Amino acid sequence: MIPRLPSNCEGVDKLLAGGIEQGTVSLVYGEAGTGKTSLALQLSREAIKAYPEHVVLFVDTEGLSLERMSQIFGDCDASKLLMIRPSSLTDLHQTLTRKLEKHPKISLIVVDTINAYVRLSYLKNKELSSRQFLEMTSILQP
């Protein structure tokens, strides 16, 4: 049985048979305002609680509100959340590579959201964008 990371949201965890599968790349899709970022923050909080010796890498491309983060994190140790804000798909790829080398104990990686970077990069150079996206996806695999 594949271990799962619960979100601590009963309805979501029921749909996901207990939470997201660990050791896999999961895509959360939905319209704007449907709670994708809230779910990502909840999963981050639960990963920090479940694995206190690890860190969570959170890639923020949307300008996450610190107020929203503190509401969800409550008394959870937010110092275990490594927040990065890359400026492009290339920067995201390079930053992820560096962080993965520097922090061998990462319990969860969240990219919220990758759409804008992929779209912009793709418009500039389709071949390079596709290659970078595939490389980035491969480095996220355990």
Predicted features and spans:
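P-loop NTPase motor core
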Residues: 86, 96-142
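Pre-Walker A adenine-sensing motif
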Residues: 7-19
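Acidic active-site catalytic centers that drive phospho-/nucleotidyl reactions
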Residues: 13, 60, 112
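A conditional alpha-helix N-cap/helix-loop micro-motif detector
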Residues: 5-9, 37, 89, 130-133
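Conserved P-loop
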Residues: 20-98
